[in-house]
Curated annotation (Swiss-Prot):
Keyword flag Acetylation: no
Keyword Transmembrane helix: no
Catalytic reaction list: tRNA(Ile) + L-isoleucine + ATP = L-isoleucyl-tRNA(Ile) + AMP + diphosphate
Motif 'HIGH' region in this chain: 43-53
Gene: ileS
Family under the similarity heading: Belongs to the class-I aminoacyl-tRNA synthetase family. IleS type 2 subfamily.
Pfam families reported for this sequence: Anticodon_1 (PF08264), DUF5915 (PF19302), tRNA-synt_1 (PF00133)
UniProt-annotated location(s): Cytoplasm
Chain location of the short sequence motif 'KMSKS' region per the record: 586-590
Protein name per the record: Isoleucine--tRNA ligase
Oligomeric form and interacting partners: Monomer.
Amino acid sequence: MLPAKYSPKDVESEIFKFWEDNDIYRKVKEKGGRKFYFVDGPPYTTGRIHLGTAWNKVLKDTILRYKRMMGFAPTDTPGWDMHGLPIEVKVEQELGFRTKRDIESFGIDKFIERCMNYALANKDAMTEQFKSLAVWMDWENPYMTIKAEYMNAAWFAIKRAHERGLLERKKMVVNWCHRCETALADAEVEYWDEEDPSIYVKFPVKGEKDTYIVIWTTTPWTLPANMAVAVHPSLEYAKFRAVKDGKVEYLILAKELADSVLGKGDYDSWEVVETYLGEDLEGLEYEHPLADEVPLQKNWKHQVFFADFVTAENTGCVHIAPGHGVEDYELGVEKGLEVFNPVDDRGVYTEEAGKYAGKHVKEANDDIIDDLYRKDLLLAEERIVHRYGHCWRCKTPIIYRATEQWFIKISELKDEMLEEIDKVMWIPEWAGSARFKDWVSNAKDWCISRQRYWGIPIPVWICEKCGEMKVVGSINEIEWENDLDLHRPKIDAVTFSCQCGGVMRRVPDVFDVWFDSGVASWGSIAYPLRKDKFEELWPADFITEGHDQTRGWFYSQLGTSVVCFDKAPYKAVLMHGFTLDEQGRKMSKSLGNVVEPEEVVGQIGVDGFRLYVLYSAPWEDLRFSWEEARNINRMLNVVWNAVRFAHTYMSLDNYSFGEKGELKIEDRWILSRLESFIKEANEAMEGYQVHRVVRAFFDFFVEDFSRWYIQIIRPRVWEERDSPSKLAAYYTMFRVIDRSLRAIAPFAPLIAEWFYQHVVKEFREGEESIFMEEYSTAEVEMIDGELEAAMKVAKEIVEAAANARNKAKRKLRWPLRELVIESGSEKVRKAVEMLEETILSQCNVKQVRVVDSFEKEIEIKPNYKYIGPLLKEKAGEFAKYVASLKEIPEKLVFDGVELDPKQAIVVDYRLPEGYEYAEFSGGVVYIYKELDDELVREAFAREVIRRIQEMRKELDLDVEEFIETTVEMDAELVKGWEDYIKSETRSQKLVFGKAEGYVREWNIEGKKVKIGIKRLRG
């Protein structure tokens, strides 16, 4: 007999040991099968896994297990992203470093070694965490971005870009982290609200006394680098005569924004002097507001240009600093402006910044504002809270600065990338057609260089003498004296001789870490060093990651793949959501709302955790709820009890699967539902919609099998051993359990394996593991849609009858004389005809009949809570209208307002004496609640039976054990039902007299009843 309660811990420890002792994973893999190329999106080895990474790997494992059971041999190489700022920043924190100079003082070689060790240690720890979630991957042979064969794949990609003219070194404005002292990709910038200065500045117009162009900025520190002002060509601008404290100024800004702006400047009055379009302002010269503080600015001419990116916001006049803004830079290049960037890698002003040299840009804001105020050029000053970008790893606010960087010309590949997106299967569809396409459509050239240490070195060597460039595309192009290590600083020592006689040295940059993972589809199989697997497998059949990867891994893979092969590197992509707290907030230590995977597993087990995260539609964010998680565990307990029930009786009777008996209608129904569930699972998994399978499983196994079918067939398992009816029930239950387990095994592998070993293989021969079995595929010929529809109606009738019983205060154990179903539906009539026996037994009534109309009076009243807000003063008229109705109309429109009839109208039935009612979708059920003497005796017998069965449980009696029962009560109360009591309680003797043995006193319907039971040995 199976344990009475489901213990996830016991099940899991046993199965983990079984898998390990018997090398099950290897044996499953050895079965082989059709090719299925899966590429694992590599997580950063920065610490412990969190709820999101756990969900991600469970999702992948589920699909891989499914594919294996479907006859595929999927690649299951786990990946690890082990380079980049994610690792560097963690190691810097461990070492107490604050700047790059700390790293160089420590020694680049030693820092690289620490990064390597940190990444490897975390990889090992995270591997154990993933394994504890029953994730089957080839953990002994992962792909790691730190391996030479993988780094070679990135070198191959950059060489292809160079050969195609897509690799370019140029000066561009990029996101810059001044703490990490490196460029960042757009995908590496995280945004949140931050408070900054908000200032309105007057730029003096050249040659016009007391005349100014008014600009607005939240980055005063960029003003030393100002080179121009931009206006929109078709926006209306005006020169205002403004008066403050008797002094007159002339201010140029967008006409429609003047009241707001000049109001902030505390002007007493203002009036329009002149209006013009933005294009009329082009060429207007002004004096730099900080020319005295930044003397270099006196060397350049400053003027107004028009630009389409200017909007009618703030002042309509935009301060342009080509060295500190992307659009500014583009306009500067177009107009031939100086790209002035007097800020170094640390975010500190250089000597070119004049007065501000040596100050950090953010710290200089106040000094600049003070200087503007002193020169009477500060029109207004405020504080603003706005979304601002921060470094994704160290969380420092970024700055924008123009620097020399290496770029892939994505702008030249964009059309091809968009075409490739259309060839991919996206789940959900809009992940590709909307979200990803939008991102790619707006993508700029990809800055692939980083000014850091721990990464794949960019394989570009440049001659110190003539500037000749060499791009290395393979590690085979380098002669190595010692162990092959492509990392800095060893690679920096490699030089080449140039034809000019000079020495070629490697550029100091490393790759953007997204370039690392971008080559995963071929780097993970060591292409181009080894070509066999690539030719057999590439491109990937399937990948899945979170929705942030539309700008991350999905994008970097597509870009590198189109560069190298003019083709998308994946055929199908499932985009999943993020894990949030119950309020929809991101989990963070600062909010104190972090839930660790181990915490969840500790409460509901590994399978409970897996089923919980897989229950939600994967592309939706998962709002973690402890109550919902525990509900999954409750449902697993229902599954356990259902399997235990079946196993108990089949085991007692030494059942062997194959003996079919005579299937009854409820057997045919549940077998039909089984195949419908499996059909749903098959279709869902082909579309990678895992949540549909989990939901369908619980709906079928918990609701249909456990809470309905088993309740119907309970009396049949007490029949004689060779009863055809009992054999049919056994056949049906076993088939349901066997096929359901194979359908849910990829999702809940531990409990499925446990049941397979302890239940399935007891009644039929099987494989060594459930994962060597084939996944269940639907036998559609067994699906009876008409029967399923009829049973759905029957269940509704039974539920409605239970509601009517509640109203009548009649327990289900108390039999009733009659159930009347009022319905004009042929579907209902046919269902009752087909399933009369089921309805009678589950409603516990003696007879059931269907009528078109039941004798009653109907009172129809308005539901004022619903109609009040909709009809207001017309509610009284509606009440009069409703009073005239004889029945509820299908459609209801009153005074031009469409109402829901079921909500707008309340129906009250006045029934014949002794009846109670309840509604269901197909009509109304009526029960006759009055009890005659015969029904009372039967009801009392059922109450006695329930108490005896409870006492059997308390004595922990086996199901088949016989007892002797003594009852102290008036025997007349159960007269005629003695044999029924004996049969239902396995009592060989039933004596009315002094209670003996194990005795308990009960209160049954106000009567004291003493019951004694004795175990009969023999």
